[in-house]
């Protein structure tokens, strides 16, 4: 049995088509990079859909929801897993990241009085404030927004039902190779 090898050239390879992967691929393409996205699942069916359509968005429930408070909530809810730099970064950019999702079609209910996404009435997931935003189509809404972020960009190619097995680094020539099945 012989295996056919196809050599391709990309500026950026993104592994995963969920929230982080789709948005990373979109950001790289926005900067002019030729992007390959590798997904183990069909596009729109990533593990991000497991979120059941909930997103943590700072200040969605109140104006005095500070970055430090959200970061601390995430650390406490995650036990010993969270890394301070990551929880701080998430807290700082949660509104901006959520707005990026909205640019790609995510449609929350809007609090008309405050002109922002409507948070759920109760604090969820270990949070001390109500900053969880729900969506009518639950996780499918996020899957669709991820799909939109990948498909509508001109420089994003993608492989579905594929596995990223290895990255071979050539430190002398900076000619790196990825093995994808």
Segments (PLM) and residue ranges:
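Conserved N-terminal/central alpha/beta ligand/cofactor-binding core
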Residues: 3-4, 27, 33-34, 39-176
